[in-house]
């Protein structure tokens, strides 16, 4: 059994595919998968690879993705390419693809790799073959059942949680991205088997959801926790509320597995963000999550000043490994990005922290009141365990011929010019609209339409589990809390 007892060093599995950095959202788009490659290269040069098991993720199949997403949406993602977009204009509108979420070469393969790492990490945790699994290419928390959103197409987090639910009665999801984790909250809004806890900027900011009063519905009432924050939050303010809230959640909910989305756009100086956290302040959340000694899946997310994303996720990998690394950056393939200081840690800016101690205390107390409404954590039900998404011999071992990798075949047309990897502020106006009402009307209409189309598919996880147990069939978690809810 892999689980470490107490505060000892944990076994860590890390998922990375060398092709991930070649995918390119387009000129001026703030989302740059290249940041994953920068992170990987930096942690290699720190020598962290010696302390963990590194796996190349399998490419998640369409069948795996439709455990949550609609068949027609995944079929669309498989089919659309830059050279056939004109044939899909109606579907592009329906599935919200084309602006914030552009069509680019290898889009579906990018989704397969991002999802493959998260699902494989969940399987590894389920098998008790690791204490922690890390997939920095995952954490794409805005994707909906039948809609792309906020640079996210396939919700790898929801799919990984569905995998964890095969073995774990209760899963806790924590989101420290600056943007509300709306796609994950929406997927599990009506079940008590997943608690979602999101700390995010709220008010005239994408995606416009995550109000303090959004607490879940039906069986899921009080199982959605939202901490709305204002501009400029710093390490001290964040630390004063994060640990108490997560400790109270652990006490009241008693999950047996945790998923932590480590979006790095909550760092100071992020191109799209407005918080003032340092890498150390951000990583404190990883330290807190680790202290509970539960199976932990760590995922990426947002982060648009890419030199700082690489710093952050490298340091958080070291924190996962209980490994101290020097502030002086080692020479690496992207060394020039980290000038002029060439240090691992960043300083906060002098921006005003609009989160007063009174405001933070008031929100914390309101959330504590909600958490006190939770019933005592339900006991574990005995039930047949469904088949794992990744078989022992399929995704984890590197059995593919490296000469047949996608990068050899097609990376030339996916590699961006050097200046596209810069962090300059004048890079273009592309990207996420940080306004709450951006296309809200159209979105609501689409969600209502999807609601009608998928009504028959929607059932509660537990009811489905019971019926499957009675019939002796394999449990299919599709439809687990997949209610499409309009933005508040």
Swiss-Prot record:
Annotated region (Histone deacetylase), positions in chain: 9-322
Enzyme class: hydrolase
Keyword Zinc: yes
Family the entry assigns: Belongs to the histone deacetylase family. HD type 1 subfamily.
Subunit details: Part of the core histone deacetylase (HDAC) complex composed of HDAC1, HDAC2, RBBP4 and RBBP7, the core complex associates with SIN3, SAP18 and SAP30 to form the SIN3 HDAC complex. Component of the nucleosome remodeling and deacetylase (NuRD) repressor complex, composed of core proteins MTA1, MTA2, MTA3, RBBP4, RBBP7, HDAC1, HDAC2, MBD2, MBD3, and peripherally associated proteins CDK2AP1, CDK2AP2, GATAD2A, GATAD2B, CHD3, CHD4 and CHD5.
Keyword Zinc appears in the UniProt entry: yes
Job description of the protein: Histone deacetylase that catalyzes the deacetylation of lysine residues on the N-terminal part of the core histones (H2A, H2B, H3 and H4). Histone deacetylation gives a tag for epigenetic repression and plays an important role in transcriptional regulation, cell cycle progression and developmental events. Histone deacetylases act via the formation of large multiprotein complexes. Forms transcriptional repressor complexes by associating with MAD, SIN3, YY1 and N-COR.
Bias-annotated ranges (Acidic residues): 418-428
Cellular component terms per the entry's GO annotation: chromatin; cytoplasm; ESC/E(Z) complex; heterochromatin; histone deacetylase complex; nucleoplasm; nucleus; NuRD complex
Activity modulation notes: Inositol tetraphosphate (1D-myo-inositol 1,4,5,6-tetrakisphosphate) may act as an intermolecular glue between HDAC2 and N-Cor repressor complex components.
Protein name per its UniProtKB record: Histone deacetylase 2
One Gene Ontology term from the biological process aspect of the record: positive regulation of oligodendrocyte differentiation
Location of the active site: 142
Gene: Hdac2
Principal location class: nucleus
Entries under Gene3D superfamilies matching the protein: Histone deacetylase domain
Record-listed S-nitrosocysteine modification sites: 262, 274
Stretches the record annotates as Disordered: 389-488
């Amino acid at each position: 059994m892999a689980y470490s007892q107490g505060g000892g060093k944990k076994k860590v599995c890390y998922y990375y595919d060398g092709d991930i950095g070649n995918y390119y959202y387009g000129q001026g788009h703030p989302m740059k998968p290249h940041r994953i490659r920068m992170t990987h290269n930096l942690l290699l040069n720190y020598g962290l690879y010696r302390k963990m098991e590194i796996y190349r993720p399998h490419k998640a199949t369409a069948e795996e993705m439709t455990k949550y997403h609609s068949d027609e949406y995944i079929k669309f993602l498989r089919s659309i390419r830059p050279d056939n977009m004109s044939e899909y204009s109606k579907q592009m509108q329906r599935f919200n693809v084309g602006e914030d979420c552009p069509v680019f070469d290898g889009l579906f393969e990018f989704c397969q790799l991002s999802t493959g790492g998260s699902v494989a990490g969940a399987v590894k945790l389920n098998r008790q073959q690791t204490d922690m699994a890390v997939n920095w290419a995952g954490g794409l928390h805005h994707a909906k059942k039948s809609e792309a959103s906020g640079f996210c197409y396939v919700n790898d987090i929801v799919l990984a949680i569905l995998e964890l639910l095969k073995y774990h009665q209760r899963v806790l999801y924590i989101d420290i991205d600056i943007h509300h984790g709306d796609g994950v909250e929406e997927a599990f809004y009506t079940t008590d088997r997943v608690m979602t806890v999101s700390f995010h900027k709220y008010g005239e900011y994408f995606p416009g959801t995550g109000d303090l009063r959004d607490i879940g519905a039906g069986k899921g009432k009080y199982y959605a926790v939202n901490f709305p924050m204002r501009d400029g939050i710093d390490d001290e303010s964040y630390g004063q509320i994060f640990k108490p809230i997560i400790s109270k959640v652990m006490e009241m909910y008693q999950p047996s597995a945790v998923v932590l989305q480590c979006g790095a756009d909550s760092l100071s100086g992020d191109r799209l963000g407005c918080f003032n956290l340092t890498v150390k302040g951000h990583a404190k959340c990883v330290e807190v999550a680790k202290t509970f000694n539960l199976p932990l899946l760590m995922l990426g997310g947002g982060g648009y000043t890419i030199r700082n994303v690489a710093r952050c996720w490298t340091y958080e990998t070291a924190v996962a490994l209980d490994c101290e690394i020097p502030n002086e950056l080692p020479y690496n393939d992207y060394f020039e990005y980290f000038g002029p200081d060439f240090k691992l840690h960043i300083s906060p800016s002098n921006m005003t922290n609009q989160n007063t101690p009174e405001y933070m205390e008031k929100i914390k107390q309101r959330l504590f009141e909600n958490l006190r409404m939770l019933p005592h954590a339900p006991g574990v039900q005995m039930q047949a365990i469904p088949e794992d998404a990744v078989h022992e011999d399929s995704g984890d071992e590197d059995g593919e011929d490296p000469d047949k990798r996608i990068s050899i075949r097609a990376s030339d047309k996916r590699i961006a010019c050097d200046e596209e990897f810069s962090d300059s502020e004048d890079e273009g106006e592309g990207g996420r609209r940080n306004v709450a009402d951006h296309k809200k009307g159209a979105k609501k209409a689409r969600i209502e339409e999807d609601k009608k189309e998928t009504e028959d598919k929607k059932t509660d996880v537990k009811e489905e589990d019971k019926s499957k147990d009675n019939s002796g069939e394999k449990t299919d978690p599709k439809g687990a809390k997949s209610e499409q809810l309009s933005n508040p």
